[in-house]
Amino acid sequence: IKFIIIIFEYWSFWMKNFCIITNSYKDEKNSIANKISDYIIKKGGSCVVLNNVDTATGQYRVILEEQVPGNLECVITIGGDGTLLHAAKDLEKLDVIFIGVNKGTLGFLAEISPEEMEGSIDRLLNDRFNVESRMMLCGQVIRNNEVVYKSNVLNDIVIHRGGDMAISNFDVYVNGQLLGKFQADGIILSTPTGSTAYNLSAGGPVARPDSHMIILTPICPHSIGTRSILLSRNDEIE
């Protein structure tokens, strides 16, 4: 599964139909979203604005595919990396491009500032951009031979001991064969895009974001010699 992020160079592609997903806690009264939407419409494009935070409860609101236009080509997120990650997860089945406007703290993914957005929109409308594909992971929770939860993620899948103070034991299998036994607080399975997130904090390597691999990194392992392991994107890990 691929996530598509935009880099402003050159690509032969026509872009007119947009959806803006904004975090109202970081974009007060949707002021940035409305400004960008007005600019897109002024330039001849179409745009809808959606909010992914329930202002009454402060909880994240899932964006449904039915809420976005059928001819959608580009999703613009306003917030931080989390806003973009949520949008990519919600709309991962759609063949669209994602671009992030940073109103958060880190901005690894949402790296365009609000001040740069009009120039970026001009590049989109005039076919001066490049598209970079990003792989995603599919995770399942299986209980009694039944899949009880399934989700696709852009950054990482984390298996953690939770509130238990004792160290946990993890038997990791790859394609049905035992890879190793780990004593640790948890296991991170990261994409190259997620390699700069929790994986990096846990001592894992940084990978090129457009590469294709899975990075397995133990969290606080009880062994000096335990290190991250690089796996194929096609491997099935249990």
Named regions from a protein language model:
Residues 81-83, 104-106, 193-195:
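Short glycine-rich anion-binding loops that position phosphate/pyrophosphate groups of nucleotides
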Residues 29, 82-87, 196-201:
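Short glycine/serine/threonine-rich phosphate/pyrophosphate-binding segments
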Residues 1-14:
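Short, Lys/Arg-enriched N-terminal segments with co-localized hydrophobic residues
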Residues 106-185:
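Catalytic core of DAGKc-family lipid kinases
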Residues 15-74, 78, 86, 115-130, ...:
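ATP/NTP phosphate-donor binding region
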Residues 46, 95-97:
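Proline-centered loop/turn at the N-terminus of a beta-strand
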Residues 177-184, 188-225:
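Gly/Ser/Thr-rich active-site loops/lids in small-molecule metabolic enzymes
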Residues 220-223, 227-238:
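A structural-propensity feature for long, helix-poor, extended segments
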